[in-house]
Amino acid sequence: MTTSQLQTEQHQVSDDTAISIQNVTISYGSYEAVKNVYCDVPRGKVTAFIGPSGCGKSTVLRALNRMNDLIEGCSLKGRVLFDGVDLYGASVDPVEVRRRIGMVFQQPNPFPKSIYENIAFGARINGFTGDMDELVERSLRQAAVWDECKDKLNESGYSLSGGQQQRLCIARTIAIQPEVILMDEPCSALDPISTLKIEETMHELKKSFTIVIVTHNMQQAVRVSDMTAFYNAEAVEGGSGKVGYLVEFNETEKIFNSPQQQATQDYVSGRFG
């Protein structure tokens, strides 16, 4: 997204909103995966997407930085506005979208490079010309993995434990200074101690970044998020399969303690899911 695009393609959204999801329906071929989603992701907060498997929460998350573009046959109707710009506008470069809206995946996926180069490589190809040593240290500190890495920066990223690798991936993401970080079940493959460190890291990161996390762990959503969106799925009328939809979006405390919808109450109380 260039400066001229920001000037000519802006739509009106609140200054408090980082990403505005407006009547979004996402399909794989003729199959609707999730439909009619409206949701404003607040700036400088942690927003959690929760819901049972197959409800479309990860599909919506991937739509926020156009990762679904990489899936053959996937299409989107509606608008996803980032700082007022429609991310699916014809002149918007998806590579630039993914630079400004980074993603941390479910499985740690460090580059087959040294710990140092895992951070430096992305910054370098994105045009960083400052003090690389300082950037590497700052990024690793922000991701709370500097102490484990500082004495072995030239060793492979694969030499780290699973939890350390995931924090390395977070450091790699923040090194190119995105404005939003998406996390797709970042702790699902980690042990409880590593999970706690990731959660503590998220609390620090939201001081500088907007974060959206998909999680199946409702206790994690309570611990880390300010806002929660509950997704569910319903049977397709006259057909097979299910389509996901957003049931309720509110402050996390309200979603878990005084939800407005019965389906939300049933899910957060463990009656289904």
UniProtKB/Swiss-Prot annotation:
Family annotation (InterPro entries): AAA+_ATPase (IPR003593), ABC_transporter-like_ATP-bd (IPR003439), ABC_transporter-like_CS (IPR017871), P-loop_NTPase (IPR027417), PstB-like (IPR005670)
Topology of this chain in the membrane: Peripheral membrane protein
Binding site for ATP: 51-58
Domain ABC transporter: 19-258
One Gene Ontology cellular component: plasma membrane
Pfam family, one: ABC_tran
Keywords: ATP-binding, Cell inner membrane, Cell membrane, Membrane, Nucleotide-binding, Phosphate transport, Translocase, Transport
Main location: membrane
MF annotations from Gene Ontology: ATP binding; ATP hydrolysis activity; ATPase-coupled phosphate ion transmembrane transporter activity
Reaction catalyzed: phosphate(out) + ATP + H2O = ADP + 2 phosphate(in) + H(+)
Annotated EC: 7.3.2.1
Localization annotation: Cell inner membrane
An individual GO BP term: phosphate ion transmembrane transport
Function field: Part of the ABC transporter complex PstSACB involved in phosphate import. Responsible for energy coupling to the transport system.
Subunit description: The complex is composed of two ATP-binding proteins (PstB), two transmembrane proteins (PstC and PstA) and a solute-binding protein (PstS).
Protein family per UniProt: Belongs to the ABC transporter superfamily. Phosphate importer (TC 3.A.1.7) family.
Matches recorded under PANTHER family: ABC TRANSPORTER I FAMILY MEMBER 17
The name this protein goes by in its record: Phosphate import ATP-binding protein PstB
Gene name, Swiss-Prot/TrEMBL: pstB
